């Protein structure tokens, strides 16, 4: 017998050829969870195999209500512009190979999204992608030195355009006023940033993908 939770699972049709599981013996693709991962995979498959039927199973009342919700994730275009863990310092030298690899993958995502926009699958890109500066922060001699080295390595790479660096209070207070407020003037701080960053609303992106299915 199905449990209470199983009874709550909802079916979302994703293509003209998809029909509910109660009326069909099988479908070509069953996607579990109506979040960004299922929506993206479904969009890929509709492009590559448009004759395949698809169905999404979701336990909640609407798609993109868990990790894909804009309130439940950072919402950044994940391109290693400000994430310091992708640029470790090893024996005094900053390594950027991982940051480059992550950025390249994000550019592939942007190409796919652009194609979907051009195909009118995603009708309103401003609803889910917008420019926003990505900023890194360092405090103390060691972190400031690291941030400067990181900036120097990334500044000349084409995947990290318009990278900037400042180790004075004025730019810090301008860019990060809430972090600057109440901080002692004696604190040695630095920031690096680029205006090439993006803010992504994965919930809105998910819903546009599913609405077009």
In which residue ranges do the predicted regions lie?
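Dinucleotide-binding Rossmann-like beta1-alpha1 core, especially the glycine-rich loop
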Residues: 75-175
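Short, flexible, mixed-charge acidic loops at enzyme active sites
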Residues: 70-74, 181-182
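Extreme N-terminal leader/targeting segments of oxidoreductases
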Residues: 5-29, 47-51
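Helix-loop-beta segment of a Rossmann-like dinucleotide-binding subdomain
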Residues: 125-136, 174-213
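Glycine-rich FAD pyrophosphate-binding loop
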Residues: 46-70
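Short, hydrophobic/amphipathic alpha-helical packing segments
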Residues: 38-42, 106-114, 206
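Short beta-strand/turn micro-motifs composed of small residues
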Residues: 33, 58, 138
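N-terminal Rossmann-like FAD-binding beta1-loop-alpha1 element of flavoenzymes
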Residues: 27-55
